[in-house]
């Protein structure tokens, strides 16, 4: 059977399960694995036994951090699932899994509806145009409301959602779903504890009218996908079940609409029909457009690869993980062609040869060896030395560089000091391995203190990285207080700033003269720097131009106000001079570095700080205290709304003011409020705060 699936890609689905942190995503994935026959015992997140959560920290914290890739089978179809984390600190995991998926199941909490993180993940899925079906989970929970959840999808996501099921009963009485396509009820009765059996019965009389109303809306949405169906519908003819399913499939694959289902993964209700919907409505690798990329070194020469075994091999490495026995495991989505284990391929992103060691299809962290990798599938590879997240692997004779991913810079940093000399060595290894796995984990040496500083996307992110250093790499280290990752930028353009680097110490000297303009700049795709060369007539030899650029970029690592990285600037090299004997790449690099510092000082430099989008959910009684507290933290209230009987306050608050917020919020609201925050943008710091930051950084 597995062999058929390799050749018949219509029977393959590469999907992700995406959601807010507590919507029940891992539990849903566990149930899928159970019903498809791979897991023999259902793993519960509550007792830390979930199959997909395979790192110790994940099992302890009950959250998913790394997206494990798992293969399972359902009705002769193969489903490759990537479980993505829902916590905001791990957006990188979500971002990279969405890049390699063909479709996704968005899981929502039946009581909360669309939450801040679900909104963020939904937007990321929009960015990569991933078709989705929605699963409203936790229908057994007190306060669960399917219709409210569907309304929040319309209001907050602006999504054209099409319910194809309705719940039967709710909260403790939730017992099944109305299938609007077949107009039957599917009911899970109490006898089968694990919910593997359900009965298909007539729709309960009290739901008949509502089912008719929602079915009409569904059929109208389906009819709009196809002129023939529209004619049939307007002519008063009934659409067949096959026509409805093919219309829903078209609606989903073109992202024109999103079918909505419901259930309770924890209570084992509604999971099998959701698996049927994955097969019926989500795309197979042949339904999605051919993978596009460019010829190495020629970014404007676009080429594509179809998902066929006859095409040249190409694949994208989307995750690197450290395995206890095999060392480095690289997860690869194969987009075209076929390649055997042991083959030589090229990492076209880096221009390096690689040999594929063993190939596996993974079940969470158990591995199933295979002989070859073919288009449309996801594999784990051992033996790749230089390949990191976002790199393309391809046929050495027909190379392509596939579109990669963009990762945000860290917003929070901590200094880390090894306790002993042997810890120092272990720390080096740990940092290298963790940085390979996680592109949002950044490291640098503080030039003033000589300390190693690590940066990440939030406090939880750094906690887990430090925890992994201790557990996996046995590094004992002291960790400093979290620090905000400030940036510096400039406000105005300065023109014709000149610098001459001259050194004469016997023998050959050093000489380089440069003239630049420096101006504020924000590029597409979040680029924060641009260098333009306008030198004419050989005033600076061509081979020295890149050195000026490199020198300017070096100087940007440490800004002129408080030593924070300088961003959002454009350097235009206008003119200069050189000396036949004394000029060198090094001399022009120094000149490039010094001229940038000189220009930045007169370009009205300012400090930027990370601003977080904060959402606090609180009972009405504490509303005044919560708003007062956010205002005292330099917060700007953006909106207030009601949700499930509580009040929700949305605000933008500087990250520097949010340390320790969780404790303050608990004490102000007697533990009844909760909050979430995601990075929003960088903004200029007020003058009084700027003075404090500069004084602290320069020790004045």
Swiss-Prot record:
Main localization (coarse): cytoplasm
InterPro entries, A to Z: EFG_II, EFG_III, EFG_III/V, EFG_IV, EFG_V, EFG_V-like, EFTu-like_2, G_TR_CS
Cysteine pairings via disulfide bonds: none
tr-type G domain sequence ranges: 10-286
Localization (cell): Cytoplasm
Gene Ontology cellular-component terms listed: cytoplasm
PROSITE patterns to which the protein is assigned, alphabetical: G_TR_1, G_TR_2
GO molecular-function terms, A-Z: GTP binding; GTPase activity; translation elongation factor activity
Chain positions recorded as GTP binding sites: 19-26, 83-87, 137-140
Xref: Pfam families: EFG_C, EFG_III, EFG_IV, GTP_EFTU, GTP_EFTU_D2
SUPFAM superfamilies for the chain: EF-G C-terminal domain-like, P-loop containing nucleoside triphosphate hydrolases, Ribosomal protein S5 domain 2-like, Translation proteins
Transmembrane segments: none
GO biological process: ribosome disassembly
Domain of life according to the entry: Bacteria
Keywords carried by this UniProt record: Cytoplasm, Elongation factor, GTP-binding, Nucleotide-binding, Protein biosynthesis
Biological role stated in the UniProt entry: Catalyzes the GTP-dependent ribosomal translocation step during translation elongation. During this step, the ribosome changes from the pre-translocational (PRE) to the post-translocational (POST) state as the newly formed A-site-bound peptidyl-tRNA and P-site-bound deacylated tRNA move to the P and E sites, respectively. Catalyzes the coordinated movement of the two tRNA molecules, the mRNA and conformational changes in the ribosome.
Family membership: Belongs to the TRAFAC class translation factor GTPase superfamily. Classic translation factor GTPase family. EF-G/EF-2 subfamily.
HAMAP family with a match to the protein in the record: EF_G_EF_2_B (MF_00054_B)
Protein name: Elongation factor G
Organism of this sequence: Mycolicibacterium vanbaalenii (strain DSM 7251 / JCM 13017 / BCRC 16820 / KCTC 9966 / NRRL B-24157 / PYR-1)
Lineage of producing organism: Bacteria, Bacillati, Actinomycetota, Actinomycetes, Mycobacteriales
